[in-house]
Amino acid sequence: MLPRGYSKCGPWLCGLLGALSIAGPCVADASAVGSTNVTVADPTVPRPPGTPCVVTLFSGDSFVDFSDHPYSYAPPGGCGTHWAKVVLEADFSVTAGRQFDRTAQLWLGGVNLYYGTTQEPSSTVSPSWHVERDLTDYSALLRQAGTGRAVLGNVVNGTYTGVIHGSARLLFYPASLRAPGALTPDSVLPLGSDAVGNATLLDTSDSPLSKTLTLPTNIDRAYLDVIAQSQSSDEFWYTCVPDSYAAEVQECGGGNFREAEVSIDGQPAGVAPVYPWIYTGGIDPYLWRPTPGVQTLNFMPYRVDLTPFAGLLSDGNPHTVAVNVAGANHYFLASATLLLYQDPHLRRVRGGLLRNTLAGQAPTPTIGDTLATDTDGNVSGAITTRLSRHYVIAGYAITSHGRVDSTVDQTVAFTDTQSFTIDASTYRQVTDQLTSVDGVSRHRIGRHLVAEYHERLRYPLHVDYSFDPTSDGGYVMATQVHQGYTNDIRREFAGRTLYAAHVSNTVDAGDTLDFDGSFNVTGHNGQQNAQSFAFRDSLGGCYRTDVASTDGVVTDEATGVGCPDGQNHVYWFTRPDGSPVSGSALLGW
């Protein structure tokens, strides 16, 4: 017998599958072959049936300095307050010329709505691009009027001439019989100190993004969306080595382990892996024209399950929630948003923490090496960095459903190998890095396992970089990069799979830069770039798009390969981009 109020698929999922047909393609059908403009394989956010209400945040703004770009927000009229879906759309462009990649952020009431970086222009190409983010889980924030800002610092002068332009809007899809209102968090709370919003600078491992909050007293689930972006000396953290090796291999120090650590009242509460984003000016700008690296234009937050702490957080006392970046070495920018589901039938949820094996496991990697330096000063060998932690965090909450026991069981691992070949004429460094998360969140009522959420996440990175002299007194720098993102999720009830999905996003890029004897760039050759994005789920949804380019021009684009009828099709309520969802939302609690 099931606990009172539960069904096998939950009223939300049952209603959706009973009422909806499969949505259409996620990208436009027009071919990009021959284009030099930004071209990506990523899916856009699938939409429910119906006409959305549109709220413009800003339109046609020019970003030429570091001044504020504030905007006022009010919920749309005529769409109700319980929406089927909310989508952020933003469009950016940069005038042709010279300009660095820049960080772009959109905020509302202290909460981050979008985070990414810009495409670098060239002397002949004025790139433009479109980004989207599913903000349905932030509906509680969007039901209230507020103030926001676009943060996009830029420098325009006689040298750096590229002017960045941007517009952004929110699309609200009203709930209907065919598109029921989404089950969303009841509270959406930022951790930053800026009431309008801005990222927090974390200079070292001890620098916190933190906030002390007195929270609602009826929390039954809690999550934290985390973004940690490398900047300045940390931009190329994935190529750095421990300080003791830096001089020998002529690389940045500080090591290459980075990981976001979440704590509650100083107690470890979870881990958010850091993605090795490479910006469009990174390593060799030609690598990323016209296709940037994985998520470069649109970062994806990682969602940390804090539900075992729900009972503790509901006790009416102030609690400090914090994020630190282990290994930060001047510096990271961080954003974090707390998402709380509240019991609609109780004013007070009581409970506590039962077990936390993450406490006492410091994020300290093991370092090894096979480096050898001969009598001529030639260096060869590798430096390895490894850390793997398995932990279990368990807690309980007395809710209107009864006592709910929640457990997060997770293994987070990091491996990095930096291989070097250095002699009088050659410098070669090969980076092989893999960050992985294998976890399961379980929720029980008595003997009944009412929700189970599995995640298998991988961030592979390979960078092969070499610098060699040429016969004419110049130099060549050859680079090959592979970036990947894969995520497999599965939701179960009573041992049966309710939903499963697989997301894969890979980018492979290569180029060779030519330098004269004074290290001025004189040209490049051999530029190639390819991206493949794939999604499949247990409902029959399928998305696959591949793009390839040579010398900055799109040479091939294919959609729907391997999908039924050769077409991309997904249900509107799924997340083909791999963006986070709350693990047990499909069960209706």
Please place each PLM-identified region on the residue numbering.
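Extended extracellular/luminal ectodomain segments enriched in beta-structured repeat modules
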Residues: G78-V87, L215-Y223, D234
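Compositionally biased low-complexity segments at domain edges in trafficked proteins
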Residues: A182-D206, L213, L346-F414
